[in-house]
Amino acid sequence: MARGAALALLLFGLLGVLVAAPDGGFDLSDALPDNENKKPTAIPKKPSAGDDFDLGDAVVDGENDDPRPPNPPKPMPNPNPNHPSSSGSFSDADLADGVSGGEGKGGSDGGGSHRKEGEEADAPGVIPGIVGAVVVAVAGAISSFIAYQKKKLCFKENAEQGEVDMESHRNANAEPAVQRTLLEK
């Protein structure tokens, strides 16, 4: 059936190719752009010898051609440790400034929310992280249990008979002479 359908499709395709359009409407050159109106692209010129770019500058030849950068000016020492200067360094005064203010004042130019006494800030990233971890753990446990059950059923000869038949197989394989000697004692 599939071979016949493929043959019919092939014949139909060949028939479409052989039959020419009556008005010559299908022409591949219509789909391609005309290159007659386009100017040819200019050939890139070679860089002149007086250009600043030289690959020899990248090679280290043992001497230092680069000028040494000037040392940055040293910051002035801060005369008042309670008001840190804009030297760009971090000191103990910055730490003390953050906790030394009264209520509502969190430090210099601090823009925090004003909380009442006894009110704690919520950590917004902790709860979703814990919930996500629990969901992933439960999903993993469920998928592992399902895979275990499939494997368990795969190796049973008859899944409907269960454990009852397994006990009967054990007793059938026992040696009758051993059973007789145990019963005689």
Swiss-Prot record:
Localization terms from the record: Membrane
UniProt-annotated stretches for the region Disordered: 27-124, 160-185
Similarity remark: Belongs to the CD99 family.
Compositional bias annotation for Gly residues: 99-111
Spans traversing the lipid bilayer: 123-147
Keywords: Cell adhesion, Glycoprotein, Membrane, Phosphoprotein, Signal, Transmembrane, Transmembrane helix
Gene that encodes it: CD99
Phosphothreonine PTM positions: 181
Signal peptide boundaries: 1-22
Record-given protein name: CD99 antigen
General remark: The gene coding for this protein is located in the pseudoautosomal region 1 (PAR1) of X and Y chromosomes.
Record note on modification: Extensively O-glycosylated.
Regions of this protein lying in the Cytoplasmic compartment: 148-185
Extracellular side: 23-122
Comp. bias regions, Low complexity: 83-92
Species for this entry: Homo sapiens (Human)
Membrane topology of the entry: Single-pass type I membrane protein
Pfam families attached to this UniProt entry: CD99L2 (PF12301)
InterPro entries: CD99L2
